[in-house]
């Protein structure tokens, strides 16, 4: 599973097929960008 938790939201992916590392980094970078 994948959990991304910040001050504004919780993103959870508990599907049996996980996301790639590149997709996870893209999500984190997008969250960081919108926080600026």
Curated annotation (Swiss-Prot):
The keyword Secreted applies. InterPro entries: Peroxiredoxin, Thioredoxin-like_sf. It catalyses: a hydroperoxide + [thioredoxin]-dithiol = an alcohol + [thioredoxin]-disulfide + H2O. It is found in: Secreted. SUPFAM superfamilies: Thioredoxin-like. GO terms for molecular function: thioredoxin peroxidase activity. Venom gland. One of its GO terms (biological process) is hydrogen peroxide catabolic process. Keywords: Antioxidant, Oxidoreductase, Peroxidase, Redox-active center, Secreted. GO terms for cellular component: cytosol; endoplasmic reticulum; extracellular region. It comes from the Eukaryota. Its main location: secreted. The keyword ATP-binding does not apply. Homodimer; disulfide-linked, upon oxidation. The active site is a conserved redox-active cysteine residue, the peroxidatic cysteine (C(P)), which makes the nucleophilic attack on the peroxide substrate. The peroxide oxidizes the C(P)-SH to cysteine sulfenic acid (C(P)-SOH), which then reacts with another cysteine residue, the resolving cysteine (C(R)), to form a disulfide bridge. The disulfide is subsequently reduced by an appropriate electron donor to complete the catalytic cycle. In this typical 2-Cys peroxiredoxin, C(R) is provided by the other dimeric subunit to form an intersubunit disulfide. Venom peroxiredoxin enzyme that may play a role as part of a redox pathway leading to the structural/functional diversification of toxins through a disulfide bond engineering mechanism. Belongs to the peroxiredoxin family. AhpC/Prx1 subfamily. This is Peroxiredoxin-4. It comes from Crotalus atrox.
């Amino acid at each position: 599973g994948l959990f991304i938790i910040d001050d504004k939201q919780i993103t959870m992916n508990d599907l049996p097929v996980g996301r790639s590392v590149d997709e996870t980094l893209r999500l984190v970078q997008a969250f960081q960008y919108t926080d600026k």
